[in-house]
Amino acid sequence: MLLGCNPSENYLKNHEVFPYSMEIVKKKKYKISVKEANDLYVKYLYDRKKIKDLNYDKTFLSPTLIIDDHYVYSFRNLVMKKVAVFGVWINANTGKITTNDESIWLEEKDIFDKNSKP
C-alpha cells in the first residue's frame, strides 16, 4: 500500500470524527440531545420497516460516532477494530436525517490517535 492511500486516514484528515461519548456531546452543546436523536432514529427505522418489533423502552441505542456535528448510527467491527462511516446520520443541530453510503471503515486506532493530538 502506498503511503497516504489509507482511506481511514484520508477521511480523518477531512472530517471531525469522535467516538460517541456524552463528554463530546456536552462539550459541543448540540441543539438535539442524544435522546431526541435516538427517538428520530427509531421513528426512521419504524417508518422504513427495518425493525418490526423494536421495544424502544427496552432497547439501548446510542450513536457509534460523531462526525461533523452528526450523530452517526453505524456499525462496529469488534474483531478488526473498525467503525463504519456508512449508516444513518442525524444532524445534531437540526435533527435532519440523511443516509451515508460511503463504504469506508475507520480504524479505531486512527480515530483515537487523531483526537489525542494537542
Language model features with spans:
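Short, non-transmembrane alpha-helical segments in secretory-pathway proteins
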Residues: 8-61, 111-118
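C-terminal partner/receptor-binding element of secreted or periplasmic proteins
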Residues: 94-118
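C-terminal motif of bacterial Sec signal peptides marking the signal peptidase cleavage site
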Residues: 3-4
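Exposed beta-strand-loop-beta-strand "reactive/processing" segments of non-cytosolic proteins
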Residues: 52-99
